[in-house]
Every structure is written in structure tokens, then in C-alpha cells.
Amino acid sequence: MKHPLPYGFAKAQQMLLEDDGRERVLWATDNTAPSALGEVLRLHAVSRVEREDSAVLTERIARVYASGESSAATVVGEVESEVDLSRLLQDLPAVEDLLEAANDAPIIRMLNALLTQAAKDGASDIHIEPYERSSAVRFRVDGTLREVVQPNRALHAALISRLKIMAELDIAEKRLPQDGRISLRIGGRAIDVRVSTLPSAHGERAVLRLLDKSESKFTLEALGMSGEVLRSFNRLVHQPHGIVLVTGPTGSGKTTTLYASLGRIDTTSTNVLTVEDPIEYELAGIGQTQVNARIDLTFGKALRAILRQDPDVIMIGEIRDFETAQIAIQASLTGHLVLATLHTNDAPSAITRLIDMGVEPYLLSSSLLGAQAQRLVRKLCPACKRVDGDGRWHPVGCAACGQSGYKGRTGVYELMVVDDALRALIHGRAAESELLAAAKTGGFVPMRDDGARLVAEGVTSFEEVLRVTRD
């Protein structure tokens, strides 16, 4: 399907011209200017004109033009033969729609193509990496890195410079790491890009984290929890006070779980405040504070200030040190519900980690409501997954999933709810093994067993569960 009208014109005039090779159909709305409509009819052999609702057509225009963009590899190939470094330093607005910048300077087109394809593929990160004789661009999709294109090594410095201009970084400083941010739109979708540059042996490398603001409406039901875990976790986040911990490595979906938890809270009658590093998504009705190392605004200092703001619920992006842990525990003991993340491998080790930080066991036993550990597993592509004779599902690979066999991700969880038996063990500084044994007696289901549920349902593969969990 071809769309002959330029994206900017189609968007502004609310017209979509579709050419399937047999006929040309022009879609318009009641807001379409008659003069623009007449001009398109004069220049193109239109078979028929159809009317559509304004909001529906606007969304459809953004969707079809975004999906119809040339691949990054194609654009990079074109750019390598026509790069014009003299236009590299053009001004670029802080927010723009990349689909409207298709005819810009070659390096700009290359970077726009990479960003557009990354958004289309659902990538969470873009890696731009220099080596001695080559360079590479890789996307992280569903938690796994894959190479997308190898641009000419001679273009690498120009690409990084263009990126620095967009992120408002110092293009002359190549010796120090730099961090910046880009706000842009791709086919009507608002996307925040966090940019990190790092000097390496063969030039600067860059990693771009993509945050799609249109996907910021989270619900606990959509995270893949089993029915029992969902019910238990929901009860925890509706307690009037105490602390709930969500644990796991970087990229395991901890912040998403906390955001979804906050979505369950009635913010009209509750004061909800967060301290984060960084603020990943803006949440309606919630006061969000970002730590800032440059001005010495740490988690601890931000939390002390938050406690003077009459909060009911406090979310802490990460407990990193004793000061933050101590304030979180004290807040939970003085009538606040505290939701926080922690870097541990499983739920029981969250308890020993806090004690190792210096938290007194008697305080922790009085305040901790529960700890949930989690990982993200890739979901089998529904278009190509196959089942063997034993009833076990396996990845295959097709065009829909980029030949990986997987498309999308979901969570595997283990939730340890603190009961009287566990409280006594925590108070007595019990070992992790004792905590785990007591939790299992109370119905605790380890993460790998939760993964087995997803395997049995055909959601993911056995190999994928083994990859992200441990014995």
C-alpha cells in the first residue's frame, strides 16, 4: 500500500491517500479544507473519496506513515554515499515529529531513521558503538540486543555529534561521559529519549533509552501475575501503613510494577509522592521528585523533604544505602505506606540485604508487609510458535517477530507475604534459608515455579524461564 501525500501535508490537512495498485482512495474529514481537497483531486487520479471521523483519521495517518518508513539499514546505505557534513550542525527544535523531517541532511535522516525504526520495533535501547575498523548499531528488543546495521566507520563521529546537538550536550567534549535528554514525536507518539555518551578506545559510544509516553498507563492485571499473587499483592498495596519491596535486577520491570501499584490508589483523597532517579513516566495526580546529584539532592534528602509534605503513600525508586533504608523504615512505622525497589535476586534476600545495610531487625520485622521478586521473560510469538509431542511450546521465528521466535514480554514473580512466623524469624536475624523454608510453609511459590505456569500455558518457553531464573 502506497501513500503518495507527504506526511506533513496529510497530517495538517487531515487527508490520507491510499494507492493499492488497483485504485486510489482519498480519505478526508469534515475539517479538510475544500481548496486542499480540490488540489489533491487535480493532481492525483483519485478513484473515490471517503469520509472519516477526524480523531480516527488523525490516528490512522500517524500509524500508517510510521509503519511505512524505510528501514534504518536502507537509509544508512543511502546516506553513506551522500553524507554532507557541512549541514550537520543545523538547528533542530527540542520537540519535532520525525516523520516530517524525512528530507533533511543525510546524517539527520540516518539518526531519524534509527529512532523511527527503534520505536516501530518496540526497542527499549539503541546502542551506537565504535570499533577499530567498523561501527555498529544495535537495538535491545524484549531484553535482547540485536544488530540492526553497521554504518560506515567514517560516519560515526558525525552521528554522535548530531546526537549531542539533539540532546543539548557539549559536542566539543569527547573525553568525559555526558548525559542528556531528547523529547520528540514519531508519528504523533510522544517519546522521551535518555542519552548517555561514554569515551572508549575508538571513539565515543552512545546508548539511548526510549520511553514511550503513550504506553504510560499501567495496570497490575497486564503484568502477568498469577491470580493468587495478584490478589495478595493488591492487598499489600492497600494497607494503611508499612513497607512493600519489589526486587530484581536492572530491567526486570520493578518500576513498572510500582507505577501500576500507584494506579490502584485513589489520588483524589490520598497524597502520593515519589522520589525517583530518573522520573520515567509522569503520573497524573501524583507528586514526583527526581534526585539530582549535581546539586546534592539525594534519595535521603528528598525523602526527608517529602515527609514534611504530609504524604499518605511514598514511592522510592531505589533503596541504595542505609540512609534511604532508615528513612523508609521510619516512615512506614509512622503511618505511611512505602513502596520501594531493591536490587536482590529473590524475595527472601531483600530482608537480609536491608539488615546488611544496617537496618535493625526489630524495626524491619515491625514494618515489612511483603517482598516481591520478579524477572521479565520473552513471550513466544503467537504467529509461529509450535508445540512438540510432549505438549511443550517452542520458538520458531517469522517476519512478525524478526525471526527471533519471541514477541513481547511478561513477568514471572515470587511474592513473600510477611506473617507472624516470618516476623519472628526476621526479629531473630534468621538466615535466608530459614526465611525461605518458613515462606514455603505459608504458601510461597518460587519464581521458577511461577515460570512453569507460563510454560504450561504456552506463553513462553522452558528455556526462557531457565535463562532468567535460578535454582
Predicted segment positions?
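Conserved beta-strand -> loop -> alpha-helix junction used to position metal-binding or nucleic-acid-contacting
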Residues: 49-60, 369-370
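Short glycine/proline- and acidic residue-enriched helix-loop micro-motifs
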Residues: 93-101
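Short, flexible helix-loop junctions that flank or precede catalytic/ligand sites
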Residues: 100-471
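Flexible hinge/switch segments at interdomain interfaces of large molecular machines
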Residues: 79-94, 207-211, 278-282
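Polyanionic, low-complexity intrinsically disordered segments
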Residues: 1-43, 57, 62-71, 81-85, ...
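Conserved beta-strand segments of alpha/beta enzyme cores
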Residues: 47-48, 271
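Long, highly charged amphipathic alpha-helices
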Residues: 35-39, 52, 56, 110-113, ...
